[in-house]
Swiss-Prot record:
UniProt-listed Gene3D superfamilies: Ribosomal protein L9, C-terminal domain, Ribosomal protein L9, N-terminal domain
Family of this protein: Belongs to the bacterial ribosomal protein bL9 family.
Annotated Gene Ontology cellular component terms: ribonucleoprotein complex; ribosome
Gene name as annotated: rplI
Protein name: Large ribosomal subunit protein bL9
PROSITE patterns on file: RIBOSOMAL_L9
Alphabetical UniProt keywords: Ribonucleoprotein, Ribosomal protein, RNA-binding, rRNA-binding
Role of this protein: Binds to the 23S rRNA.
GO molecular function, one term: rRNA binding
InterPro entries, A to Z: Ribosomal_bL9 (IPR000244), Ribosomal_bL9/RNase_H1_N (IPR009027), Ribosomal_bL9_bac/chp (IPR020594), Ribosomal_bL9_C (IPR020069), Ribosomal_bL9_C_sf (IPR036791), Ribosomal_bL9_N (IPR020070), Ribosomal_bL9_N_sf (IPR036935)
Organism lineage: Bacteria, Bacillati, Actinomycetota, Actinomycetes, Bifidobacteriales
Statement: the UniProt record of this protein carries the keyword ATP-binding: no
Organism encoding this protein: Bifidobacterium animalis subsp. lactis (strain AD011)
GO biological process: translation
Pfam families: Ribosomal_L9_C (PF03948), Ribosomal_L9_N (PF01281)
Amino acid sequence: MATTKIILKKSVNNLGHAGDIVEVKAGYARNYLIPQGYAFPWTKGAAAQAEAMKRARLAKAIATREGAVEAKQIIEGTAVEIFAKVSESGKLFGGISNEQIANALAEKVAVDPKGITVEKIQTLGEFPATVALHPEISANFFVKVVAE
């Protein structure tokens, strides 16, 4: 398969951060990353622009690192309760989304739903979850699903 170099405009999970030069399959770049505004094609001139983006991202990361440490202290080890409709057998109607978890966490700290990692929740119970607050800092917490 053919690959192509691109420069990321925004952070993409499991791929890289803004300003990173990555090599991906041509179809992924052409059909998804570039049209959705996540990336642009790599050129020699664009490589300099990528370096500027990377420097700006690093400066912002240093400023937000302190905030991420404070947020981790608040979130780490806590549990958030989410109320959901369930069938008589205890199975959820639908599932629990990252947006619902982020909204429940918003009472304590505002987080990006894209940074939340949790297994697929289909039943009542308590589930471990992780939220990325910063590229180097993440916090572990629990999602407790309770019947309405």
